[in-house]
């Protein structure tokens, strides 16, 4: 089956927003008007086509980015729905990697909100061309002009209106198109399907002229010929103006701002026109780079005749099809039934079922081309961020970077059956979401879930209970402490048990001292003259190792310690490996006491990004958490604060930071090193655990 749409006619874009700005409703309307969705799904009734997981339908928030294909004016739109909640920013970043452009939805009443700032910064990081849609213009308090000012003040970006609203709040009727200098109004009866051009209302003529002038002046700056003509009094025609707005979007010279009310079905068709007119096709953005087997840089052009290269950006477990891997094809042609290589993992895969997804209905296809976003069923090895490519022309596309999880909880299945289901379920969840990790605590044997935030883990637990029917108890978050000796100690210990028959006898003499940080446990025997026979040395080591997992301060693992066996004694009949194991264990515990063991706590490297107004509060709060500020710098119009903070003082921080900054500050943290805990902290931990 040959290609139906030229790659220049593709628009791979996402819809980004703060939670509740109307992103899912906007997507729903796009699907409705492009003829893909026959009944409009309302989020507040929990029926939106894009929000298809049970948890999303209940909470009214979008969690997974579903990819949907639709058509408008002869162009093929691949829409990637992205989540808008801060705990899911990993999903947003992942979507941004495979998008060519984005529509940023603002709540016309709220303007630029905290999460808008976060997704905007992520858009800057990946250099995603954007247009802005001021939604909810029918809401009480909606103010289009405040939205424009917010973009300048809070995002440090240059907005240019290409539409103005007609009517305010409940009287919102339509918009002024500043490119064509026409009014457009919608008929309420036809669910927004019918709209017509009108002359610009008299009360808006002056304002329309003022904003048209701003638009033209910003646009002509981008082309010397048009600028010269403009200075000679020649206005650019509609086609030229559109070409220049497109250029502005592609180079981020300015951001076109549109308006409407998706819920009231007004302004969606012109938004679709703007997606087609101004957002890039795959050939308008820089070609993707990768590396070959030898680490040399390779560029893959968006062309069907180039070697095949695709990136897996999302993995989902589908109850009917099994594992589905969403991929973006950057170059070449993908054909069902052929073999490819997963170059990230050096494994072969066979392409089985290929699907085009529409929220949660699917269409089987046999071929897909550069620029397509497809869902592949049944891949065995693929994980998020992996590259699949032609085995003869291998390439690894740039890897996605995922932040380390910052919060962990223990989970205990209630029954044996739950235990078995839990293992399978966690493996699937970890494959779907790289920011969610699972590990086993060797000390307690508990299964530990690690994630990006409290909501993130709540939803994982919810999925375990509903989708996989696992019943489990969830523990409170916990910190992993360690112990270490601080000074050299020498011990001489004799284990003697002689009560008729074969007794037990072993004597050991150790020097125990701190090792270099990160060196771990080291054992050396310097015994001479056979004081401890060679066959008993493994018993000595076994005794020492049994103490390492549970120290003398509060029962946490002992790290960075060196033990030297310098002398000992044995008995021809009563000595054994077991006797030396018991003697070594007791001697080591005594040496840990003598060597003044201390408690170590994990110190996290914390980065807070906050608007300047809140810098003082954020620093004060970090200091109160025993944090040490390492430095500050500016990123755009935000302040970046770097600090070292003990992990035990960081629980609940995300909620504190949100309330302290009205939700506008964000933070990341990762483990940096272990440090000695102050006496009061050590005493508190000993009281709890020892």
Swiss-Prot record:
GO biological process, one term: ribosome disassembly
GO function terms (MF aspect): GTP binding; GTPase activity; guanosine tetraphosphate binding; translation elongation factor activity
Key word Kinase present: no
Ligand binding (GTP): 17-24, 81-85, 135-138
Compartment(s) of residence: Cytoplasm
Predominant place of localization: cytoplasm
GO cellular component, one term: cytoplasm
Gene3D superfamilies: 3.30.230.10, 3.30.70.240, Elongation Factor G (Translational Gtpase), domain 3, P-loop containing nucleotide triphosphate hydrolases, Translation factors
Location of the tr-type G domain: 8-283
SMART domains found in the cross-reference section: EFG_C (SM00838), EFG_IV (SM00889)
Similarity section: Belongs to the TRAFAC class translation factor GTPase superfamily. Classic translation factor GTPase family. EF-G/EF-2 subfamily.
PANTHER family, A to Z: RIBOSOME-RELEASING FACTOR 2, MITOCHONDRIAL, TRANSLATION ELONGATION FACTOR G-RELATED
Function: Catalyzes the GTP-dependent ribosomal translocation step during translation elongation. During this step, the ribosome changes from the pre-translocational (PRE) to the post-translocational (POST) state as the newly formed A-site-bound peptidyl-tRNA and P-site-bound deacylated tRNA move to the P and E sites, respectively. Catalyzes the coordinated movement of the two tRNA molecules, the mRNA and conformational changes in the ribosome.
Name of this protein: Elongation factor G
Gene source species: Rhodopseudomonas palustris (strain BisB18)
Upper taxonomic lineage: Bacteria, Pseudomonadati, Pseudomonadota, Alphaproteobacteria, Hyphomicrobiales
Gene from which this protein is expressed: fusA
